[in-house]
Amino acid sequence: MGYIKFQKDRKFEIVPIGRVAIDFNPTDINRPLSKSMTFKKYLGGSPANIAVGLSRLGKKVGFIGKVSKDQFGKFVVDYFNNEGIDTSQIKYAENGESLGLTFTEIASPTESSILMYRNGIADLELDVNEIDEEYIKNTKAIVISGTALAKSPSREAALKALELAKKNDTVVIFDVDYREYNWKNKDEIAIYYSIVGKQSDIVMGSREEFDLMESLIVKEKSTDEESAKRWLGFGNKIVVIKHGKEGSTAYTNDGKSYKIKPFPVKLLKSFGGGDAYASAFIYGILEEWDIMDALEFGSASAAMLVASHSCSEDMPTVKEINEFIKEKKEQYGEMIARG
């Protein structure tokens, strides 16, 4: 493929940075959250889900973050260890900060919402002194989550990781991952998103997330093509713009674009697909696949997740994704997602 050059012989292939949380998904679904009485606990947070997804796909994964110094923090570290994810750079909060909690609502397969508790949380207390240059130097790529930029000191820690990655030829993947919690205003969002977006190698986000990132750059909202040209012009090699059920498009720095559609599945929920998409797409990039193959792999993984109850726990393996793609193509035709 040749768009991204990864350094060889590094200990880790990918290291996400930022949010890790606990998801509580209702087991009594198809009703509003206020009516749900029973929930199942899962590991959550986009960077954490991406880490699990890539580890399930066979990659050597590390993680940089901070968790609560309690049973929930122990749950995260134990879960990562069981998944084969390195936890040496996961720090414990020392001042009573909690792990972020997310309660999800599955009112119907197409009506889902998320209630987050994000005040006084551990992941936003990650400090610049807790970012180890050797760790950044020893991975092929880092994933910076936009939520890590929402508040200090996590904001500065993420920016330090960005600078160290650029210094050490470590690829930077920016997953915009917008959550309204903790941000003061939209100007603040645009400023910090742009700082990372202008220095990353791959930037991934929804149309709405690109609009937020560009709100101080342009007078009117951009088209996908205009946004892609802008961020490729800043030095990104790949720009991925997602439109949910309408599919997504990857734009590359040689002027090409590649569009993928979702695979048809019976929806259980309308959240969680983005993290599966990101992990599987990044897997394809690490494997130096053609862009369309990486997009198809990501789209398939996303479809599998929105048909499942959890995010992290249901992340598929390479074999499972390939079997899913094969089954769907036999059922609907070779070009089902590529049309």
UniProtKB/Swiss-Prot annotation:
The record's annotation in CDD domains points to: KdgK (cd01166)
A single GO BP: inositol catabolic process
- GO terms of molecular function: 5-dehydro-2-deoxygluconokinase activity; ATP binding
Keyword S-adenosyl-L-methionine listed? The answer is: no
Its UniProt pathway annotation is: Polyol metabolism; myo-inositol degradation into acetyl-CoA; acetyl-CoA from myo-inositol: step 5/7
Give any Pfam family that matches: PfkB
What InterPro entries does its record include? Answer: Carboh/pur_kinase_PfkB_CS (IPR002173), DKG_kinase_firmi (IPR022841), Myo_inos_IolC (IPR030830), Myo_inos_IolC-like_sf (IPR023314), PfkB_Carbo_kinase (IPR050306), PfkB_dom (IPR011611), Ribokinase-like (IPR029056)
Reaction(s) this enzyme catalyzes, per UniProt: 5-dehydro-2-deoxy-D-gluconate + ATP = 6-phospho-5-dehydro-2-deoxy-D-gluconate + ADP + H(+)
What does the record give as EC number? 2.7.1.92
Query: What domain of life is recorded for the organism?
Result: Bacteria
- Keyword annotations of the record: ATP-binding, Kinase, Nucleotide-binding, Transferase
Q: Which family does it belong to?
A: Belongs to the carbohydrate kinase PfkB family.
What does this chain do?
Answer: Catalyzes the phosphorylation of 5-dehydro-2-deoxy-D-gluconate (2-deoxy-5-keto-D-gluconate or DKG) to 6-phospho-5-dehydro-2-deoxy-D-gluconate (DKGP).
The record's NCBIfam families line, in alphabetical order, gives: myo_inos_iolC_N
Q: This chain belongs to which protein, by name? A: 5-dehydro-2-deoxygluconokinase
Please name the taxonomic classification of the source: Bacteria, Bacillati, Bacillota, Clostridia, Eubacteriales
Give the encoding gene's name: iolC
